[in-house]
Amino acid sequence: GSEMFIRDSVKTVAVLNSWGQQRAWGCHMVHHALYQKQNYSYAGVIEALSGAPFDVKFISFDDIKVDPKVLDSIDVLINVGDGDTAHTGGKVWEDPEISSAVKGFVHRGGGLIGVGEPGGHQYQGRYLQLAAPLGVEKETGFTLNYDKYNWDEHRDHFILADCPDHDVDFGEGKKNIFALEGTEILIQRDKEVQLAAHEYGQGRGVYISGLPYSFVNNRVLYRAILWAAHDEADLHKWFSTNYNVEVHAYVKNGKYCVVNNTYEPQDTTVYTGDGSSFTLHMDANEIKWYNL
């Protein structure tokens, strides 16, 4: 089989939930992935990962409990779903071994992406148990009188660079999320944070309120992973400037292809593995193959 290792050092991304490998890829599907209003803003993350040029793993909280070193081989950890569910962990965050392993992973230089209510569980004065690395918290009524001064948006961020008008469709989004001090808000709506970036020790956290699948959101997650992994410099490798077009490299087979995912003609600039580029016009649904 052809492996899609498109980089010399492909990034490893792990989805963290209560099932891990047991429900790999199926963790946000119900009954043949029928549309659910409560679910599509999370399922989009898994769908985007399925076609992304990363080595994707699914790990459980038990995996971390048995061997915290399981995190050593991972570049970016993703926790996605509603609070107090098996998706995000719920009561598992009361276990200091798991909590410290995940926070320590980020603090030492790892990346973390939280979608929805990551680590959502009311405990020790916090709701989002991943608030420290992600730099955001949910107002559940207990901290109404806390001063919340951080509301400035930074839409010129690396993560939003490919988005029309530097905006994002967050699907159902989330209400009542606010940013802690030192967090960079990328997008907030009516004083509710939808997208934020945060430096935590040597690592980075990205909060996203929801991410239904679309070609634009595909690119948002791709850039968020690169940013969280301190890998922005690698953006222009096997890359299409037009988010409707994708580049897939099969380095071991000496080939790469460029795919127009739409029913309309598209123009793009394609970057190859060494960072060199060329412009390309593509017909509707066209796939072009090239030799390396």
Predicted regions and their residues:
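Glycine- and acidic-residue-enriched helix-capping/strand-helix junction motifs
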Residues: 22-46
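A short, well-structured beta->alpha microelement
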Residues: 49-68
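Short acidic/histidine-rich motifs immediately flanking catalytic phosphotransfer sites
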Residues: 70-77
